[in-house]
């Protein structure tokens, strides 16, 4: 819980979130126009219905309904058997019809939750999930405004939480977890930079211990988790300062200026009656039966939380490794392919350490890696069957990234095969001990740390190719004689 110290009293922050998630589908919610709008030329992905041409009627995209139900199930929601579409009436240049089709009275899903494991398993209640149209995009340039309708009519899921957050850290965990789930079930790509996931934050403050909520302000269209946190923190402090100075906090809609780090009013906040909601006469209500809900439920993949639990149970992974490997779908697929052929801990160690280290340096994702899961399996094969040592394997791994060649070919071309000939290693060990006779005496007098020095000298002579287990055994044997 975030407490803001004041002169009159201490203040508690109360936060609710409305997340707008763009539905992954090929066509828009009520038209056949393409949703591939991000890099498209302005006004090229537009159907007549999207720009409200007279006589054009909406045709519901069933797949968007399917995606919304899938999301509701993944977020532990109740899927409503009856839901319907309404018109939200307001004027704005990028909304050509003068109304947005949404679900005000009968949303598709209600009563869900997300559990915040890093905050004592706190449950954040999800009030509702409803489908609605996105608006177009206004582009302001000097003294003119241009409208791009490519985005108009794209399906959004609005995921509305209850005002259960009491800190920006809780907000951040919720958004990360929500985005992770949406990506896993492939209902939204979660790309905040491209606007696929946008967040509105409702912020108010109240005296600590008070049961009465304060007047809230809504901060619109936040497109990164960092900006969400900054905007909420600024707005909460602004409200506290106003109340401490005897001012009245009014209900406003705000924008967050990322340059100044401040919020600014764009309009006085409207209430629901200002939008004159009424049922859309051009769309039938949705009646969803148990059979359809079960069909959607059966299509859900294993969720990240379930994967993490399985990784800790089946592979004995640490919570840290299980968290990392289960938090991204592509990473989880990669890990499971490798763990199917090799020890899970060994696979996790190489992926979270060696692989991620190189990916981070290159600034690429696991899907862009030149080393596939099959390549890593082959490399681990060479370690397990003692063809190469772990140290040499790291060198081979680097060469795999650079050349794209198989590990076996690299080992062959560079002569990196591990030396496991006992007689040859015995000769090298004998030579190392003879050349370090004084240190051998020190070792036998109790300076046992020198054992590692002897191992290092042998590895140096063999350019790291000696079998380390055999080297340890032979050195121990010769020192005891």
UniProtKB/Swiss-Prot annotation:
Query: Protein biosynthesis among the record's keywords?
Result: yes
InterPro entries registered for this protein in UniProt: Asn/Gln-tRNA_amidoTrfase_suB/E, Asn/Gln-tRNA_Trfase_suB/E_cat, Asn/Gln_amidotransferase, Asn/Gln_tRNA_amidoTrase-B-like, GatB, GatB_C_1, GatB_Yqey_C_2, Gln-tRNA_amidoTrfase_suB_CS
Q: Which UniProt keywords apply?
A: ATP-binding, Ligase, Nucleotide-binding, Protein biosynthesis
Catalytic activity, EC: 6.3.5.-
Spell out the subunit comment.
Heterotrimer of A, B and C subunits.
Q: What does this protein do?
A: Allows the formation of correctly charged Asn-tRNA(Asn) or Gln-tRNA(Gln) through the transamidation of misacylated Asp-tRNA(Asn) or Glu-tRNA(Gln) in organisms which lack either or both of asparaginyl-tRNA or glutaminyl-tRNA synthetases. The reaction takes place in the presence of glutamine and ATP through an activated phospho-Asp-tRNA(Asn) or phospho-Glu-tRNA(Gln).
So what family is this one in? Belongs to the GatB/GatE family. GatB subfamily.
Q: Spell out the PANTHER family in the cross-references.
A: GLUTAMYL-TRNA GLN AMIDOTRANSFERASE SUBUNIT B MITOCHONDRIAL AND PROKARYOTIC PET112-RELATED, GLUTAMYL-TRNA(GLN) AMIDOTRANSFERASE SUBUNIT B, MITOCHONDRIAL
Q: What is this protein called?
A: Aspartyl/glutamyl-tRNA(Asn/Gln) amidotransferase subunit B
What lineage, starting at the top, does this entry show? Bacteria, Pseudomonadati, Pseudomonadota, Alphaproteobacteria, Rickettsiales
């Amino acid at each position: 819980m975030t407490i803001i110290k004041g002169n009159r009293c201490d203040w508690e922050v109360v936060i609710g979130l409305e997340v707008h998630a763009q539905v992954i589908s090929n066509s828009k919610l009520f038209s056949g126009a393409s949703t591939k709008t991000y890099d498209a030329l302005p006004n090229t992905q537009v159907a007549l219905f999207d720009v409200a041409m007279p006589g054009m009627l909406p045709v519901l995209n069933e797949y968007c309904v399917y995606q919304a139900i899938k999301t509701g199930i993944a977020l532990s929601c109740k899927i409503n058997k009856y839901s319907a579409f309404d018109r939200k009436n307001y004027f704005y240049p990028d909304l050509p019809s003068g109304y947005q089709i949404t679900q005000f009275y009968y949303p598709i899903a209600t009563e869900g939750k997300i559990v915040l494991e890093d905050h004592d398993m706190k449950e954040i209640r999800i009030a509702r999930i409803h489908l609605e149209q996105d608006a177009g995009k206004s582009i302001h340039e000097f003294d003119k405004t241009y409208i791009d309708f490519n985005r108009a009519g794209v399906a959004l899921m609005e995921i509305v939480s209850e005002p259960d957050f009491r800190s920006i850290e809780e907000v951040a965990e919720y958004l990360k977890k929500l985005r992770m789930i949406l990506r896993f079930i492939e209902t939204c790509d979660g790309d905040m930079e491209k606007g696929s996931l946008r967040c509105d934050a409702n912020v108010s403050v109240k005296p600590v211990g008070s049961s009465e909520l304060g007047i809230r302000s809504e901060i619109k269209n936040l497109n990164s988790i960092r900006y969400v946190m900054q905007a909420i923190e600024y707005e909460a402090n602004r409200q506290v300062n106003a109340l401490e100075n005897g001012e009245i906090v009014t209900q406003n809609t705000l924008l967050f200026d990322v340059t100044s780090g401040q919020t600014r009013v764009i309009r006085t906040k409207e209430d629901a009656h200002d939008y004159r909601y009424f049922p859309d006469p051009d769309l039938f209500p949705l009646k969803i039966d148990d059979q359809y809900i079960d069909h959607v439920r059966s299509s859900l993949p294993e969720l990240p939380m379930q994967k993490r639990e399985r990784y800790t149970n089946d592979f004995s992974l640490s919570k840290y490794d299980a968290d990392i490997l289960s938090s991204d779908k592509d990473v989880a697929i990669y890990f499971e392919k490798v763990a199917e052929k090799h020890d899970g801990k060994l696979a996790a160690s190489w992926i979270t350490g060696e692989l991620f280290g190189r990916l981070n340096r290159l600034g690429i994702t696991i899907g862009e890696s030149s080393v596939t899961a099959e390549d890593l399996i082959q490399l681990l094969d060479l370690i397990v069957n003692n063809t190469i040592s772990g140290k040499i394997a790291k060198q081979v791994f680097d060469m795999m990234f650079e050349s794209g060649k198989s590990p076996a070919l690299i080992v062959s071309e560079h002569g990196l095969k591990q030396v496991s000939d006992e007689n040859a290693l015995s000769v090298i060990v004998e030579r190392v001990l003879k050349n370090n006779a004084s240190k051998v005496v020190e070792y036998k007098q109790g300076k046992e740390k020198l054992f590692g020095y002897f191992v290092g000298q042998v590895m140096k002579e063999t350019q790291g190719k000696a079998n380390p287990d055999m080297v340890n055994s032979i050195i121990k044997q010769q020192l005891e004689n």
